Amino acid sequence: MSGYGMSVNDTTIWWQVYPLGFTGAPIRPSNEGERALTPRLDAIIPWLDYLIDMGANGLLLGPVFASETHGYDTVDYYRIDSRLGDDAAFDRLIDACRSRGIRVMLDGVFNHVGRSFPAFRDALAGHGHESMFHITRNAGGGVDYRRFEGHPELPELNHDSEEVVRLVTDGMLH
């Protein structure tokens, strides 16, 4: 078909890596805070040549943003999970991919967040951001919310909310 170029997905063979598991990160972030950073993302770099040897030319990274446990319970879309390192570690991985001609795709978890997500905590307390979630309050003061696949630690985002549209857009452009 003339006039139509091939898309990235037509020309990319992806190798998927779940960084928290692949790098042996602890199940939960350290209580010691940011000072305890270990640049575990660096452990992926030596595997990039293997990716190419397998015939792949794209790295699909599972969740890399700050989360409470498994990466799919995001608490901050603008910070690399401290168990994986920091922005500098992420930049080194991206630079190593670029130098080898490897495309990178991130797994953006925008269907739900973790219970410690600041806007969710505010919404539960009645301090704003309620429209971002499917929250119901009963007459007795109880609060309920829609959960991803029934998991209470994964509050669903309300994609009809303008705040959520901005959150997702800003997160993808960050």
Name each model feature, range by range:
Residues 3-14, 18-57, 64-174:
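Substrate-binding/active-site clefts of carbohydrate-active enzymes
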